[in-house]
């Protein structure tokens, strides 16, 4: 028997020893997935574009909150962050910081809230300019997580989870350094690229899955899109015209949606040319969704993630030859040139830590997908541990389609007879006002009222709270509206009424100029009177409203 060199020294003469070449190959394979030094160097341009898009999405999120945050969660807002954090502290005790990770534990005053938003805006601008991108994106993520963790019902949107998940993974995807350019010396690790693509896949596939699992007949009888454009949270004027296209078009849209979400997205797992075809199918679709419905920054995240289906081999043809950097040329690069040196222990420790975190996210999201599909065979505890950070999410858009458009309108009065409406900034209200295109701006107050209109006031306490705030002439809450009908004074009575809205026909619009018609359904919540001593009293009970969803 031939003794291998080194057996005696190891004291394991009889133990099998793997050939060195096999061990080396295994090490290289692992490092190709987790070590940026051996990363996906054919995705440098794509990464650069994606990170600029992510920075713009962060900017839109912080910018829209800057004008709303005091009225939403300020000390005098509808759901004060301080009250929410206090409730979290009482429930979770010593683990409250884990269950609600937020800078607002330090302070949640109005100046503190707006300061965090300004810091987020500044960091998003730095990230867009590619200055300290990894650090800038980390600051963006911390600031946005701080809001989401403290905002209660005002941060329960899937788009918030999408941004936090993509933002966290991007901390490992982005290049380091103050001004890295394309980051050819610090390419993205393959695991981070794969997880961003995996998020893109799950947004589509899980949305298709919930449509099938919900049992909503509208998806099965191909009528789900018949009133979709009218009933969406914030319609657009383009959606108005698409709504009036023939039923065959709406039915075809249903089929296309299901095919894309349940079938075409699997093209992600095919070779690069197939992924390119997928990219050129889904991108126009997402642009169409943006034009026909205001879903804040949701579709912009999906667009940005979808761009990672492309690679530099394809994009290089659009780059002038004199601008091409060797790092983005199609030829393979010498990976040995990026072998770690003996002094790179700190680097390898970072690779191991980042690999652990990213594998944790990968497992958690896979377990949630398997559970959603009805096969709870994987433990969900790892996913539950990450839940407070919103970095391993389940998605499922439009599982059940709404069957009508309902709008809550706040009205004030000084005599209880003549009522003046508080005008919203973005929600449909005036019949002759065209619905606009506002995304990626997100008016969270308007959005939450759309959801509230589908239920009753007992389960949507933001409605009676808003009534009281208007009676108190709270300027932060009044700032959530377009205008104050009482010019800075408080009315004596406030009520919330419920309307049902429909798009007008094309012929009616030509004759009247109205985009909408509506019917009053009744009093949504109790009308409230403020007495001379400052106490509140119910002036009228809510009406018994017809069923609506």
Segments from the language model and where they lie:
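Basic polycationic patches enriched in arginine
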Residues: 3-4
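Short, low-complexity intrinsically disordered segments enriched in A/P/G/S/L with frequent Arg
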Residues: 8, 13-18
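Alpha-helical membrane-anchoring segments
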Residues: 21-549
């Amino acid at each position: 028997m031939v003794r291998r060199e080194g057996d005696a020294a190891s004291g394991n003469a009889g133990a099998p020893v793997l050939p060195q070449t096999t061990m080396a190959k295994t090490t290289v394979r692992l490092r190709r997935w987790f070590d940026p030094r051996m990363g996906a160097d054919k995705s440098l341009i794509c990464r650069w574009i994606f990170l600029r898009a992510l920075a713009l999405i962060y900017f839109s999120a912080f910018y829209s909150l800057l004008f709303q945050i005091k009225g939403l969660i300020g000390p005098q807002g509808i759901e004060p962050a301080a009250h929410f954090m206090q409730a979290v502290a009482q429930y979770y005790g010593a683990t409250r910081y884990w269950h609600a990770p937020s800078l607002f534990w330090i302070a949640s005053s109005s100046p503190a809230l707006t300061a965090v938003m300004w810091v987020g805006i500044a960091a998003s601008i730095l990230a867009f300019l590619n200055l300290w991108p990894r650090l800038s994106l980390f600051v963006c993520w911390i600031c946005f997580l701080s809001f989401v963790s403290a905002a209660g019902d005002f941060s329960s949107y899937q788009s918030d989870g999408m941004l936090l998940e993509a933002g966290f993974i991007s901390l490992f995807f982005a290049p380091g350094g103050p001004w890295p350019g394309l980051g050819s010396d610090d390419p993205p690790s393959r695991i981070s690229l794969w997880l961003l693509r995996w998020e893109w896949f799950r947004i589509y596939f899980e949305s298709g899955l919930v449509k099938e699992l919900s049992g909503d007949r509208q998806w099965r009888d191909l009528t789900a899109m018949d009133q979709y454009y009218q009933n969406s949270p914030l319609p657009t004027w383009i959606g108005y015209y698409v709504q009036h296209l023939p039923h065959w078009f709406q039915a075809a849209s249903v089929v296309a949606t299901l095919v894309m979400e349940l079938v075409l997205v699997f093209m992600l797992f095919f070779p690069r040319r197939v992924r390119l075809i997928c990219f050129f199918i889904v991108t126009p679709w997402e642009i169409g969704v943006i034009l026909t419905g205001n879903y804040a920054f949701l579709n912009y995240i999906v667009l940005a993630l979808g761009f990672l289906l492309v690679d530099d081999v394809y994009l290089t043809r659009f780059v002038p030859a004199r601008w091409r950097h060797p790092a983005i040329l199609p030829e393979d690069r010498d990976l040995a040139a990026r072998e770690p040196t003996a002094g790179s222990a700190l680097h390898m420790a970072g690779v191991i830590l980042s690999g652990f975190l990213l594998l944790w996210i990968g497992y958690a999201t896979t377990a949630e997908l398997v559970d959603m599909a009805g096969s709870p065979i994987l433990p969900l505890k790892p996913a539950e541990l990450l839940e407070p950070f919103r970095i391993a999410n389940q998605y499922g858009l439009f599982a059940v389609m709404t069957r009508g458009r309902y709008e809550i309108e706040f009205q004030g009065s000084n005599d209880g007879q003549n009522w003046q409406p508080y005008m919203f900034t973005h929600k449909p209200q005036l019949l002759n006002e065209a619905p606009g295109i506002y995304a990626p701006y997100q008016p969270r107050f308007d959005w939450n009222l759309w959801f509230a209109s589908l239920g009753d006031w007992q389960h949507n306490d933001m409605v009676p709270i808003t009534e009281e705030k208007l009676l108190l002439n709270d300027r932060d809450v009044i700032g959530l509206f377009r205008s104050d009908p009482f010019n800075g004074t408080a009315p004596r009575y406030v009520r919330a009424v419920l309307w049902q809205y429909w798009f007008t026909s094309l012929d009616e619009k030509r004759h009247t100029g109205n985009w909408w018609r509506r019917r009053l359904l009744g009093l949504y919540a109790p009308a409230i009177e403020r007495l001379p001593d400052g106490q509140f009293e119910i002036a009228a009970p809510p009406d018994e409203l017809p069923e609506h969803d």
